[in-house]
Amino acid sequence: MKEGIDMRESVAEEPKHKFFQSTEGENKSLDEVNGSVKVPKNAGFWRTLFAYTGPGILIAVGYMDPGNWITSIAGGAQFKYSLLSVILISSLIAMLLQSMAARLGIVTGKDLAQLTRERTSKTMGIILWLITESAIMATDVAEIIGSGIAIKLLFNIPLVVGILITTADVLILLLLMKLGFRKIEAIVATLVAVILLVFTYEVFLAGPQLDQMFAGYMPTKDIVTNKSMLYLALGIVGATVMPHDLYLGSSISQTRAVDRHDRQDVAKAIKFTTIDSNLQLTIAFIVNSLLLILGAALFFGTNSTVGRFVDLFNSLNNSHIVGAIASPMLSMLFAVALLSSGQSSTITGTLSGQIIMEGFIHLRMPLWAQRLLTRLLSVTPVLIFAIYYHGNEAKIENLLTLSQVFLSVALPFAIVPLVKFTSSKELMGEFVNKAWVKYSAWVATVVLVSLNIYLILQTVGVIG
């Protein structure tokens, strides 16, 4: 055993002087943390669940990033509680697909990018890497805009300076990686808790109509017949699955030490990883519901503009719009939650970038360099817009709409292979998708891909 450890250490130390390293021939996804979290043997349910708790929160972050906020709040402001049913259905689809991604990683010992690359050419691997990297950068743009505006609102500094400050998260990430994977999970969980508590408090103050709120979780035909409502519903469903979250989920499910030759150990890992994923995605569902409920309780019927972060911030401090609960503290709490959302997504974006680079093009670079490169590529267009429009937040937020197009383009290249691989008896053995799971997943795939194509065409103006 000691000999194996020494060999691993010598391999880890060998490429220190190499900036780019080839990962061809390596099988482990995120090798530095793969199997690094020990799971107690023969422990009780709660102790075992605690050991598996963590990866799910990193996945859930993608479902409550700043890019989703405006759609949810605007949905409530325009159509009250009617679109809560769309959030519910979207969350159930997310739970299904993320559980499949985790199961794929646990059973095969490889992530989605690695398995896709094994079945495609080198050229196609590069193309898929570029498409998925573009999606990660698009998510990064949303984080930068959200974090930059939050910093400006909290500290009253120029937006350009706030955007530049967001690049400092490279240093934060380096520190977190040294602390260990469990510490990363705990810090992200803390940031998510801040978001959850802020919006729970603000919804409590807003005093929503509970009977109408719960009725909103039942779908109505208006969602399909009302064109404006349909467009917002498409926006919510279209953002259901972040493509890079599927790659991430298939990889970080392998951070727990599992004996893949032991059927019971694999089955246990699948069970508890799925529970963790569903619990954390339930939190994301609650946060997105709270955002829509807040929009409905405070802004429905007021004719207020709530399509921008700054509009929302100012409205929460305006008694003519939100009534007696308006206060500077309410606005500041919103900005704190916005900053927490942007920063919590930083870690998952970096890990996803490493996974797809190693999986698709068999290349590894230092995390700090990868994060810096991704962030600089994302910051550049935002900075150009910020300087050109003299720090006008409303103009800059238009980039959010454009960034969603990249996410929509990348989605089919992640979701179709995922369903195909997890439905393969050859790959998954006895853990292959059950019939109802397979058919449900294919229906969800067709719906999501179709909606994303529709959104792309609508965004670029091909259809009205």
UniProtKB/Swiss-Prot annotation:
Induction: In response to bitter compounds derived from hops. Keywords: Cell membrane, Ion transport, Membrane, Symport, Transmembrane, Transmembrane helix, Transport. It comes from the Bacteria. InterPro entries: NRAMP_fam. It is a multi-pass membrane protein. GO terms for cellular component: plasma membrane. It is found in: Cell membrane. The chain crosses the membrane at residues 57-77, 82-102, 125-145, 157-177, 186-206, 229-249, 281-301, 321-341, 376-396, 399-419, 443-463. GO terms for molecular function: cadmium ion transmembrane transporter activity; manganese ion transmembrane transporter activity; metal ion binding; symporter activity. The keyword Aminoacyl-tRNA synthetase does not apply. GO terms for biological process: iron ion transmembrane transport. The keyword Ligase does not apply. Belongs to the NRAMP family. H(+)-stimulated, divalent metal cation uptake system. This is Divalent metal cation transporter MntH. It comes from Levilactobacillus brevis.
